[in-house]
């Protein structure tokens, strides 16, 4: 057995292999197909986004894609990616994973006019000088998740602004009136107590 090992070692040193040499990476060898091409999953990026051509700086709608009527029209949005901030991780400051979505709020006809006005008042800090509503997300290390988060933020804004306040019932009006009366009564009581304390501290100068 030892002699056989020595013979194999000597032949390998001389450049002659009795058996085919082992693969450098077993995982890569398993992923190789019979025709020599590398196996790729159906969820690989080049199969999910065949028209992207490796571009990670901007997002565009693939050709032939249909947009649902109840969803956000992606062709009216300006979507871009940039470096994600924050400490730690190998992808930080190396991959464009932070998503930024912006659109002109005043001309967004896919949102009702009253809803747009309410969004402009409620989220005025997210609107720039050009009237663009800007939303960003860097909660994930993946671009598509951050993009989905930005779109969900837009949906939440529209849903929140679309809700109309409910009319108060008679019981609510009565309860509100009682609370105001109790609050005024307590305020006057505290005022009388404070006035009595100030009067007790007063010293007569004879």
From Swiss-Prot:
Organ and tissue specificity: Down-regulated during the in vitro differentiation of HT29-D4 colon carcinoma cells.
Key words of the record: Hydrolase, Methylation, Mitochondrion, Protein biosynthesis, Ribonucleoprotein, Ribosomal protein, Transit peptide
InterPro entries found in the cross-reference section: Mito_Release_Factor_mL62 (IPR052104), Pep_chain_release_fac_I (IPR000352)
UniProt main location, coarse: mitochondrion
Outcome, altering residue 89 to S: Strongly impairs peptide release activity
Enzyme class, UniProt record, top EC level: hydrolase
This enzyme's EC code(s): 3.1.1.29
Transit peptide: 1-29
Keyword Zinc attached: no
SUPFAM superfamilies: Peptidyl-tRNA hydrolase domain-like (SSF110916)
GO MF annotations in UniProt: peptidyl-tRNA hydrolase activity; translation release factor activity; translation release factor activity, codon nonspecific
Recorded coiled-coil stretches: none
Family to which the UniProt record says this protein belongs: Belongs to the prokaryotic/mitochondrial release factor family. Mitochondrion-specific ribosomal protein mL62 subfamily.
Name of protein: Large ribosomal subunit protein mL62
Species: Homo sapiens (Human)
């Amino acid at each position: 057995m030892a002699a056989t090992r020595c013979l194999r070692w000597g032949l390998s040193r001389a450049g002659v292999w009795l058996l085919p040499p082992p693969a450098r990476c077993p995982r890569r060898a398993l992923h190789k197909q019979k025709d020599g091409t590398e196996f790729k999953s159906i969820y690989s990026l080049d199969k999910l986004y065949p028209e992207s051509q490796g571009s990670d700086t901007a997002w565009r709608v693939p050709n032939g894609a249909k947009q649902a009527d109840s969803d956000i029209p992606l062709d009216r949005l300006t979507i871009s990616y940039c470096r994600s901030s924050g400490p730690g991780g190998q992808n930080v400051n190396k991959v464009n994973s932070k998503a930024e979505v912006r659109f002109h709020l005043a001309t967004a006809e896919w949102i009702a006019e009253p809803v747009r006005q309410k969004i402009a008042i409620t989220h005025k800090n997210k609107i720039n000088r050009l009237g663009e509503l800007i939303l960003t997300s860097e909660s994930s290390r993946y671009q598509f998740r951050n993009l989905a988060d930005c779109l969900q933020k837009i949906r939440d804004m529209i849903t929140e602004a679309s809700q109309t306040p409910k009319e108060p019932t008679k019981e609510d009006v009565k309860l509100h009136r009682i609370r105001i009366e109790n609050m005024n009564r307590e305020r006057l009581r505290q005022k009388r107590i404070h006035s009595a304390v100030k009067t007790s501290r007063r010293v007569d100068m004879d």
